[in-house]
Amino acid sequence: MAEESNVHVKVAMADVMALFVIAFFTFLVGGLGLGVFDQPAILASIAVPVGILVLVATIITYLNENVLGTAIFGPLAVFFLVFPFIPADSAGMLALVYIGLVMLIDTVLSLAQPVRLLPIVLFIAAIAFIVTGLWYNGGATDATL
């Protein structure tokens, strides 16, 4: 008989680390939108470390057989890793709308979970990505919209 072996990484929930760094990035986006920062380069400089930490969380959730966490954090890790290379034009807008659609798909997938807070948070994140994508037209100000 063959023995079955499962590898589990014994750490305190990698999801929390991923959510923390995503929230940190979101605070910087909010600060840029509110005029606290005047250069969007701060987002590009912090996006790669955020992407690396979310990728680590994705690998840990995969090893812990958390398919939903892998489906949520995997595309976000790729998005944050390529964020500095997203142009400020219609292609950048489509990238943000695309990740918003991926979050909407994750929202539908998470409806099978017994916890109802996750679909709500994912839906809000999807709407935020889509609205940011529609606003992302080369750094326009509110007066030009």
Identify the meaning behind each predicted range.
Residues 52-87:
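Membrane helical hairpin/interfacial module
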Residues 1-61:
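N-terminal topogenic module of multi-pass integral membrane proteins
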Residues 24, 51-52, 78, 100-101, ...:
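Hydrophobic alpha-helical cores of multi-pass transmembrane domains in eukaryotic membrane proteins
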Residues 9-12, 35-41, 85-92, 113, ...:
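Extended, compositionally biased regions that are outside compact catalytic cores
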Residues 38-51, 88-100, 120-121:
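Structural signature of hydrophobic alpha-helical transmembrane segments
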Residues 60-70, 108-120:
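Membrane-helix interface "capping/anchor" motifs
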